[in-house]
Structure formats: C-alpha cells, structure tokens
From Swiss-Prot:
Active site: D746
Subcellular location: Cell membrane
Residues carrying covalently attached carbohydrate according to the record: N231, N336, N390, N403, N492
Protein's UniProt name: Ephrin type-A receptor 3
Chain positions of motif PDZ-binding: 981-983
Domain Fibronectin type-III per the UniProt entry, residue ranges: 324-434, 435-530
Organism of origin: Gallus gallus
Cytoplasmic side: 565-983
Summary of the tissues where the protein is detected: Highly expressed in the developing brain and embryonic tissues. In adult, the greatest levels of expression occur in the brain. It is expressed in a graded manner across the retina with the highest expression at its temporal pole. Detectable in all other adult tissues examined, except the liver.
Keyword Glycoprotein: yes
Gene: EPHA3
EC category name: transferase
MF term (GO), any: ephrin receptor activity
Modification sites for Phosphotyrosine: Y596, Y602, Y701, Y779
C-alpha cells in the first residue's frame, strides 16, 4: 500500500465533518482550540517521520491544520505528538476534547498483526515552557482512546464521513501549565481538532444579585459564592449560590430588593420614569402618579401635588392629592327662645376626601360694642361644637333677645395645609324673649310666731328684665290643697298672717315680658312658737355652730375611709394586675415579640377577620376557572387587580350559598390565622371579601399545586440538592410558625403548596374544621379526628399538640419528599399504624435516600418528644447538607439499617404467590406483567434475583415501577429467609 496516499484519504474523511461542529456552551473556557490557530500548529513529532501535519479547508473553505499517522505496516510503532505549552489560567480540572477519524484495520489488507484501532493520550505539568526536547517518561497517561466508529475503504468511496468525538478529564492540575501528548502504536488515525478547556460558572444575575465568573475548586464540593446586589438595590437576605464542578449554578438563597424609586426590569433595577413613583424598597413595579399629582424626575419616591392640592401625613403615597372642601350650603335656623337648631347641606365639593367634618363658630353681636365677640363658655353645642360628621347641631343656653352669628366651617384632612381662606357658611339670628331660669336658693332671714322674712338672688339667666316674682306658699300638712300666692318687686319679702309653730312650704319664680320661669324647688321653713323669736343675727350664730359640728363629724369619717382604702389598695394591687394580665383579651403580647393570636378568643369572630385580614372589593377580583371543590364551596383560580398595583394571579376559595353562621365563622377563621403570618415559605393571604356575596378568601396562586401530587407527577426528575432545597423551605416556614407560638397540627405534603420556582409554602390552617371531612383522618379520638399517618404518638393518645408533634409530622413529610409522594405506611390500617409506631417500628428509608436525611427522619420520630430536633436545628442541618453536597452521596446501607423498620406492603401474604404475575399484581405493578411473560424471569425464584440493569433489558424503564419492584424484591428476600425449609 502507498503510505503517502492514505493520509490524504483520512484528511478528506475528516474535513467534511469539521464544519458541522456545534457551538461550545457558555460555561466552557478554551485554553487551546487547534481549529482557531492560523498557520502551522508547530507541535513536536517524535520521531520526526511519525505524525504529519496536514493543511486543508473545511466545508466553509476555512483553513484548518490536522495531524495524522498511518504507519500500519510495521511492528512496534511508537510515534509521539506533543503540543506546545498550554497555560492553565485559574483552572484545576481540565477537559480535553478530541475529534478524529480512524480506519478499520479489517479494511486494510495484510496488516492484521501490526494495525491498531486505538491511540493513547498523555499530559505533563510544568510551570513554564522549557521542554525543548521530548522525554517520554515525563508524561502521565490519561487514557487510551478508541473510536466509536471507524471507516472503511467503501466508506471513502461512498463519501460517508465518520468523525469521532471523545472528551477526557485531566486533573486536578496545580502547576502554571501543561503539555498534551498523543502516542500512536500503529493506528491509521487523523487528529482533526484538539480543544482544551475548563468549566466555570459564568457571570449571572439571580434575584437581582450578581454572581461573578467562578471556577470550581475541585471535584468533590460546591463553591459557595456570595452575590452582590445590582445597582440601586439592597439585600433582603444575603444572596448566595453554589457553583458545581460542571459549571452550573445551584441552590439560590436570599435576594435583593430594588430601592425606593427603582423597579425591577430584566435583571436590573431601573429608575422610575417621570410620572411614576415607588415609595419603598421591594420588587414591585413603579406605580403611576395618583390623580392631581405628578413628578418630572427619574427615580421619584413620591409624586408632588398640584397647586392647591395636598396630601396629609397619614395619606399613603398611593392616595390621590386632595383639597379642602367648599363651603356648606343651604343653612336653615330654627329658633326656640334661647336655643337654635342649625341645619345645612353638604358642600358641593368634598375635595376628593371622605373625612369631611364641620366646626361651628359662635359670635355674639350688638350691645355696647358694634364688633361681634366670641360667645361665652356657657353656650353649649349638642352633640359638640367641632368635628361634626352630621349636618345638624343644636345650640342651647343662649342669651334671650340677643343677636348671634354662626359660621359653619367645612374641613377635611388637608384643610390645615391650605393657605386659602376658610370655606364657611354664615347665618345670623336673634333669640326670642325667654322665661328666666329657676331661682336656686331661698334664704330665711327672720322668723316670728306669725311671719317669715325671705330673700333670694336674681336668676342666673334672667333672659330679659325681671318684672316681678311670684311667691307661692302653703302649710306642709295641707299638701298643696290650699295655697297662697303673692307678688314681690324685689328679691326679698316678709310673709305675715302665718300660724305659730307651723311648717310652711315656699316656691318662687321670676317673670319677664315673655312669661314666668320655672318655679324653684320647694323650701320648708317653720314659724316660731308663741314664746320664742329668733333674730336673723342669732339665727346665723346657731347655724354656724351646727355646721361646724357636722363638718367635724364628716371630716373624721372621710379620713377613716381614705386610710382604709389606701391599705386595701396596697394589699390588692398586685393581685389586680395579675387578673388584668390574665383576663385581658385571651392572649398576651410581649414588647418586641410577635405572637400568634387565636381568633377563637374573640367574642365576635368578625372582629378577628377585620383585624388580621384585608377587606377586598369584589370588583377587583376576576375568576378564570374552577379548579376544585372544598368543604364550603368551590376553589378557583383568578386574578386580583388592586388600584395602582400590578395584576396578579390568585387562588380563590368561595363560600357556597345557604351557609350557616357557624360555617361562615369557620370559613373565615382560616383567613384570621393566615393574615397573621408574613414569611416567604408561608402561603400569603391577599385578603377576604365579606361585604358582598359570595364570601371569598383570596391567597397567592401556587402554579404547581400540592407537593405530594407534584412529586408523583415528576417521579425521579429532581436532584437530591433540589429536594433538600424544597425541604429547607418547608422547615424555614415551620420555624417561623414555631417562633410565633403556632402549632400547625396537620403538616403533610398534601398541605404544602409549590410554585413554578419550586418554592414550597406551608398552607391549610383550618385543622379544626377540615379534619372532620379529611379522608386521612379516619381515626376518631375524644376531641375529633386527626391524620393518623402524620401525627405523633402523644398527639394520638393524649391530643397533646406542640411544635414537637409538628417535628414528628415534618419527618413524615421528609419521607414523602424523598419517596416522591408515596403514601406513608402504604395500605396499613390506622389501627396497625398506631400499634406499630407505639411498639417502636419506623418507616424504612426511601430508595436511594441519603443516610444523613434518613437519620434526620429518625430524629424527628423519637418517641420522647423532648429528644426531637427543633425546627431551628432542622434548618441548620439542611443548610449544612446544602453547603456540603458530598455528604448526600452516602446512601443508607441496607445492612446497617435499624432492625425496627416497617416493610413496604407488610400486609401482603407473600406465601399466596405462585407465579410472577401473581407477585406483580400483589405489589401493584401488574402493568409490568406482560413484559415478563416468555422470558427467563417467569417464576418468583428467578424474578427475585433481578437487578435494575436486568429490568431495563426486558423493558421496565420507568423509574416508578422499578422502585416498586426493587422494594418488592427486598420483601420477597426477607420472606424467603424467614420461611421454613421443606424436608
């Protein structure tokens, strides 16, 4: 054979394929790419007549350089080709990609003893380019390279191109650079291209945090990289990700929030445009300026009000700017002697606000001064003078026959900010002539056997000129059946013609031009006996003496009472405080600590709903479709569009028509609970609708639904790191609930919702009502029904629910996640589950479950609740596993498992199986029965020896049935070992 013709054929076979090379991924950094080098490669060939450098063009007529070797006729070939020195930059792990063609030795005549179909790849590390001469012993072998496809002479004739691509790893390397070498031992091979590269995690932006180009350190662990927030943002939680050895970013934690005045656009925080604003940090869009406000700058925190429009300190930035109201209208006065009722109409313009109130200014006009002056403090306004919310007021205790002016101001929340003149309506009135007020005190100045001298003061409110006084008197024993009236012009009178030693009753009233006033209260005075007469002077002395004696007695009593109360107060003060603390509102709030408040402690459940849940307008909610049915009504998906906010997807629970008050209270009870929580791993309550029908609870929408069904649908499709990330989110949410003092009681994968970003959130806080209709709560105790498969032993036996019982339930959720949604305890009855757990049996580890995670399950299932981990500890454990993923590669060893594990399908009678079909049906894998028909695995004895590779060969390629069959085989092996041996 012509040795110089064969290289040309090899080159032709290779160049046609070189142009169809795919673009390299973005996480690969080339250290060498022979296709990109212009001119000769200049690699060293040893011996010099071995490898030969050939020039050519690809299908795009781009020049490329290749090396080939085709000395297949001679024995003991040892032809070496060494590259130039390649700097490694920052890489520790190097990848070598070879593209080559190789001739099938069978297609070359007379070379069966000398022709080879492989070649060898070597490397040597060096800190500099000093290797002038080739020394074979200095190189370390990487691998022997063989072709997946080799070509023949017929392929060349048909122009069938067979280009091989092989990639090998080198490293870790530590020196500054290295050489590659290729050893030919007798193959007909053409080296079309050599690409040397390393992998990096490329620069990326995640959750508004920038992560730089990162090169993996080694092949065993992830590199934790701290992100930096993009411009105009700040950390909410320190952002970090992990760089894998494959150059992939994993497990994003934390995020950044755009500053006030900036919104998230793409992967950056961009300034709000003119006409838009954002008042606080957060990843929400800038809002359009509300009515009567504007902004002309970028990055506005709020919008400035137009001229004569204002925003009060209590108004949120999203509220429209408003102005003071116009004046009240149509004032009407209704005068009744010394009182007046004022009525008016609402202003035509309320200024755009609902907090309009009215103030009354009263002015007294006329008299000696021609200027009006403020009314005296004696004038009263009913119900009050300022802050009126209704359009009527009654003014009493005015002076009779007096001119008054009343100014009615209309004000609202921004009136104090305006410099414009007051907006008021005025009305002037004159009060009528009125009766005088009653005389309050009548004094006895002198008595005799047949007369009494009386005096009094003018009425406090004469309401005009007093014309005279009417004095009415009669004997007390006559009971007003016969009385006498006399009139006096002054404020004193002497009444004569009375009987000695007789008690008389006196009443006096004043008269003005209007009429008589009301009579005074009744005063009783007694005339003197026949032989006794007291002057007014002596009478005063006697009265002073009596008054002094009475005062001393009263003072003694008061001092005694005060001393007793002071002592009693000191004794009871502590106890009173304790009662106040204990019986306040059914709960105690400590300063600086947010605690859960049980809505059932409220006498009025509606108060709890209004306190913790936001009332939504039903017009802002649109329902798209019904996605399910709940206990009280339908569950829908829809959209919520609040004013000045972006439309969001929501889940909507509705209360069906014809509900009872108890059903409504139970329905809204869950909202009262949810509304108290604010955590990224707790389902967020958007609000409730209670003022219209149907009554609704609106929450954030979780695209992937419940975690258990999601995992069953995506069986074996996630990495362990992704599953641990989900579990970490659940644990973080439960830590938050535990810190608030809330016990969930129904923690299960079916009550965990998962969104499109694989973020898990704890939901379903209506245990007290839901469990009554939950099919998983078929075991009844004294207090109702509880989900047996997820509930701790002490909660089942004593209904003792604590955060420790939630930790037990978390262990079951952990088992559900790692088994991709399998049902805990499978088909065991509730009584069998209770008995097995009480006897110390625990669930076995799921298939391929990391030992660290199964140990965490067992810790959560400690019988003594005090030995179970707290959720804070669980979060810490999962964080450590995420930071050190190599620890998750240790799978639970079947031989090292505890002996007290429950077997899957433990209630199946294995002895009843006679054929493989019976066995597969018994373990719920009957769909595989047809595959095993007619093959060597047709009996139980042979099928018990099947491996995962064997299953793939016969067609069982789906992971779910594979897992069930493997679990069934373990059960069959256990049964076989424990079965008696026939004799």
């Amino acid at each position: 054979m012509d040795r110089r013709r064969l290289p040309l054929l090899l080159l032709c076979a290779a160049l046609g394929s070189a142009g169809r090379l795919s673009a390299r991924p973005g996480n690969e950094v080339n250290l060498l790419d022979s296709k990109t080098i212009q001119g000769e490669l200049g690699w060293i060939s040893y011996p010099s007549h071995g490898w030969e450098e050939i020039s050519g063009v690809d299908e795009h007529y781009t020049p490329i350089r290749t090396y080939q070797e085709s000395n297949v006729m001679d024995h003991s070939q040892n032809n070496w080709l060494r590259t130039n020195w390649i700097p490694r930059n920052s890489a520790q792990k190097i990848y070598v990609e070879l593209k080559f063609t190789l001739r099938d030795c069978n297609s070359i005549p007379l070379v069966l003893g000398t022709c080879k179909e492989t070649f060898n790849l070597y490397y040597m590390e060096s800190d500099d380019d000093h290797l002038a001469k080739f020394r074979e012993h200095q190189f370390t072998k990487i691998d022997t390279i063989a072709a997946d496809e080799s070509f023949t002479q017929m392929d060349l004739g048909d122009r069938i191109l067979k280009l091989n691509t092989e990639v090998r790893e080198v490293g870790p390397v530590s020196k500054k650079g290295f050489y590659l070498a290729f050893q030919d031992v007798g193959a007909c091979v053409a080296l079309v291209s050599v690409r040397v590269y390393f992998k990096k995690c490329p620069f990326t932006v995640k959750n508004l945090a920038m992560f730089p180009d990162t090169v993996p350190m080694d092949s065993q662990s992830l590199v934790e990289v701290r992100g930096s927030c993009v411009n105009h943002s700040k950390e909410e939680e320190p952002p970090k990700m992990y760089c894998s050895t494959e150059g992939e970013w994993l497990v994003p934690i934390g995020k950044c929030l755009c500053n006030a005045g900036y919104e998230e656009r793409g992967f950056a925080c961009q300034a709000c445009r003119p006409g838009f604003y954002k008042a606080s940090a957060g990843n929400v869009k800038c809002a359009k300026c509300p009515p009567h406000s504007s902004t002309y700058e970028d990055a506005s925190l709020n919008c400035r009000c137009e001229k004569n429009y204002f925003r009060s300190e209590k108004d949120p930035p999203s509220m429209a700017c408003t102005r003071p109201p116009s004046a009240p209208r149509n004032v009407i006065s209704n005068i009744n002697e010394t009182s007046v009722i004022l009525d008016w109409s609402w202003p035509l313009d309320t200024g755009g606000r609902k907090d309009v109130t009215f103030n009354i200014i009263c002015k007294k006009c006329g008299g000696s001064s021609k200027i009006c002056e403020p009314c005296s403090d004696n004038v009263r306004f009913l119900p009050r003078q300022t802050g009126l919310t209704n359009t009527t007021v009654t003014v009493v205790d005015l002076l009779a026959h007096t001119n008054y002016t009343f100014e009615i101001d209309a004000v609202n929340g921004v009136s104090d900010l305006s410099t414009l003149s007051r907006q008021f309506a005025a009305v002037s009135i004159t009060t009528n002539q009125a009766a005088p007020s009653p005389i309050t005190v009548i004094r006895k100045d002198r008595t005799s056997r047949n007369s009494v001298s009386l005096s009094w003061q003018e009425p406090e409110h004469p309401n005009g000129i007093i014309l005279d006084y009417e004095v009415k008197y009669y004997e007390k024993q006559e009971q007003e059946t016969s009385y006498t009236i006399l009139r006096a012009k002054s404020t004193n009178v002497t009444i004569s013609g009375l009987k000695p030693d007789t008690t008389y009753v006196f009443q006096i009233r004043a008269r003005t031009a209007a009429r008589y006033g009301t009579s005074s209260r009744k005063f009783e005075f007694e005339t003197s006996p026949d032989s006794f007469s007291i002057s007014s002077e002596n009478s005063q002395v006697v009265m002073i003496a009596i008054s002094a004696a009475v005062a001393i007695i009263l003072l003694t009593v008061v001092v005694y009472v005060l001393i007793g109360r002071f002592c009693g107060y000191k004794k009871s003060k502590h106890g009173t405080d304790e009662k106040r603390l204990h019986f306040g509102n059914g709960h105690l709030k400590l300063p600086g600590l947010r605690t859960y408040v049980d809505p059932h402690t409220y006498e009025d459940p509606n108060q709890a709903v209004h306190e913790f849940a936001k009332e939504l307008d039903a017009s802002n909610i649109s329902i798209d479709k019904v996605v399910g049915a709940g206990e009280f009504g339908e569950v829908c998906s829809g959209r919520l569009k609040l004013p000045s906010k972006k439309e969001i997807s929501v889940a909507i629970k509705t209360l069906k028509a014809g509900y009872t008050e108890k059903q409504r209270r139970d329905f809204l009870g869950e909202a009262s609970i949810m509304g108290q929580f604010d955590h990224p791993n707790i389902i967020r309550l958007e609000g409730v609708v209670t003022k219209s029908k149907p009554v609704m609870i609106v929450t954030e929408y979780m695209e992937n639904g419940s975690l258990d069904s999601f995992l069953r649908k995506h069986d074996a499709q996630f990495t362990v790191i992704q599953l641990v990330g989900m579990l970490r989110g659940i644990a973080s949410g439960m830590k938050y609930l535990s810190d608030m003092g809330y016990v969930h009681r129904d923690l299960a994968a079916r009550n965990i919702l998962i969104n499109s970003n694989l973020v898990c959130k704890v939901s379903d806080f209506g245990l007290s009502r839901v469990l009554e209709d939950d099919p998983e709560a078929a075991y009844t105790t004294r207090g109702g029904k509880i989900p047996i498969r997820w509930t701790s032993p002490e909660a089942i036996a004593y209904r003792k629910f604590t955060s420790a019982s939630d930790a037990w339930s978390y262990g079951i959720v952990l088992w559900e996640v790692m088994s991709y949604g399998e049902r805990p305890y499978w088909e065991m009855s509730f009584q069998d589950v209770i008995k097995a757990v009480d006897e110390g049996y625990r669930l076995p580890p799921p298939m391929d479950c990391p030992a660290a995670l199964y140990q965490l399950m067992l810790d959560c299932w400690q019988k003594d609740r005090n030995n179970r981990p707290k959720f804070e500890q669980i979060v810490s454990i999962l964080d450590k596993l995420i930071r050190n993923p190599s620890s998750l590669k240790i799978i639970t060893n079947a031989a090292a498992r505890p002996s007290n594990l429950l077997l899957d399908q433990s209630n199946i009678d294995i002895s009843a199986f006679r054929t493989a079909g019976d066995w597969l049906n018994g373990f719920r894998t009957g769909q595989c029965k047809g595959i095993f028909t007619g093959v060597e695995y047709s009996s139980c004895d042979t099928i018990a020896k099947i491996s995962t590779d064997d299953m793939k060969k016969v067609g069982v390629t789906v992971v779910g049935p594979q897992k069930k069959i493997v679990s069934s085989i373990k059960t069959l092996e256990t049964h076989t070992k424990n079965s008696p041996v026939p004799v």
